[in-house]
């Protein structure tokens, strides 16, 4: 599958678009609907994936592509790294109150054994340093 391909699931009322998002790996793809993005290991909550096969330029372009999506899109990423990513983000953007607030909420959420995923693309744009 590659950019522009569509998976139609009529019984679920879903048309899932494929986005090419290299960076973490050279062949990474994401699955996108009007309301959801399954980003795999390209975009995490408050972070992004390591560069295993892709280049920094590829990752930059992939994250820029994702950033153009609607703020209302919910991001479902491949791992639950929110707390550690926010701890890092708080060292990069020390004066970002949104990061501090989100970190506090994420710590409480995880303490209760609840997931912090999904997160809206809007909150990602406010708190993700990448």
Regions found by a protein language model. Name each.
Residues 64-74, 83-130:
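Accessory terminal helices/loops
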Residues 1-93:
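Catalytic core of the metallo-beta-lactamase
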């Amino acid at each position: 599958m590659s950019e522009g391909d569509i998976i139609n699931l009529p019984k679920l009322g879903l048309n899932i678009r494929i986005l090419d998002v290299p960076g973490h790996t050279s062949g990474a793809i994401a699955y996108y609907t009007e309301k959801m993005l399954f980003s795999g290991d390209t975009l995490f909550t408050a972070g992004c994936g390591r560069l295993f096969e892709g280049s920094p330029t590829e990752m930059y372009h992939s994250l820029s592509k994702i950033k153009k999506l609607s703020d209302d899109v919910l991001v479902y990423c491949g791992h639950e790294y929110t707390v550690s990513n926010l701890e890092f983000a708080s060292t990069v953007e020390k004066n970002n109150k949104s990061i501090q607030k989100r970190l506090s909420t994420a710590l409480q959420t995880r303490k209760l054994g609840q997931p912090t995923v999904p997160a809206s693309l809007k909150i990602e744009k406010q708190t993700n340093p990448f």
